[in-house]
């Protein structure tokens, strides 16, 4: 992923820049659903977070959404939308497309800089997000309203979409309760790690040798450490964000044409070209 704040900022800028009045009205009308959609499969990463808890393979499902059957996901998703009319779900799905655009554009840089070391990967993403928020809104990530992206009741239309996709493409059993809990746990974890208490820091220290990852990498630092990336690299990151925003607007318009104007899938599917959320080609 880029982290939550980056995805929210991308989504907000897409709404602002959208020049199709009908689509803009849809996204503004279901703004919270759209912005949660911008978190994509990250929704499942923190299900039942904590050591030794039964996670029912839900976080792994979030990982699989990023790398397995990505084209099939977007094809099956758009077909499902054509058969199951829901503005709530459609807005969420359009946000999911934006998650893909941002991940696809930014992940190659992060993987290269982190040398595929997970702790370094997250440190870089959190520092990039912190700096981007400061530059675009003059706000510190430590003061960001982490509850705002989750402050709504998840529609059953969205849950039922995931249940369908998970079973058909990934042989993963989900339920409405699991999906609602995933959203709740995502929110709780982001709030907890924004200002981690002594308990979290202690548990992070205990967990590190067990999970081979430093949970403190999921915490926004008081200030950025520029050893992780140069100012030139940060400027390239911002350029990649702007490219992802433009890409998102194009794919949103194409998806809208498929669902609302019954256009064929060919142009829409061309946006995915065998590339997963990590920027890796699978064909």
Language model features: what each stretch is:
Residues 1-94, 100-283:
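N-terminal leader/auxiliary helical segments
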């Amino acid at each position: 992923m880029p982290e939550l704040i980056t995805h929210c900022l991308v989504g907000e800028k897409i709404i602002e820049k959208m020049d199709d009045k009908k689509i803009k009205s849809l996204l503004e009308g279901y703004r919270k659903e759209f912005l949660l959609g911008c978190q994509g499969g990250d929704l499942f990463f923190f299900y039942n977070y904590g050591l030794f808890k039964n996670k029912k393979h839900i976080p792994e499902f979030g990982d699989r959404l990023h790398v397995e059957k990505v084209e099939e996901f977007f094809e099956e998703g758009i077909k499902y939308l054509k058969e199951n009319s829901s503005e709530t779900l459609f807005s969420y799905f359009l946000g999911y497309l934006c998650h893909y655009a941002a991940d696809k554009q930014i992940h190659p840089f992060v993987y290269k800089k982190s040398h595929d070391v997970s702790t370094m990967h997250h440190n870089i993403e959190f520092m990039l997000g912190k700096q981007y928020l400061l530059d675009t809104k003059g706000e510190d990530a430590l003061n960001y309203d982490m509850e705002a992206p989750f402050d709504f009741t998840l529609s059953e239309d969205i849950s039922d979409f995931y249940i369908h996709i998970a079973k058909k493409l990934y042989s993963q059993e989900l339920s409405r309760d699991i999906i609602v809990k995933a959203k709740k746990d995502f929110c709780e974890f982001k709030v907890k790690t924004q200002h981690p208490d002594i308990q979290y820091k202690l548990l992070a220290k205990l967990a590190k040798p067990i999970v081979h990852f430093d949970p403190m990498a999921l915490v926004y630092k008081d200030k950025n450490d520029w050893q992780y990336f140069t100012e030139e690299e940060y400027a390239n990151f911002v350029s990649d964000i702007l490219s992802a925003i433009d890409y998102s607007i194009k794919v949103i318009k194409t998806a809208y044409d498929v669902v609302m104007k019954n256009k064929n899938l060919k142009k829409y599917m061309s946006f995915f070209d065998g590339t997963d959320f990590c920027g890796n080609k699978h064909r």
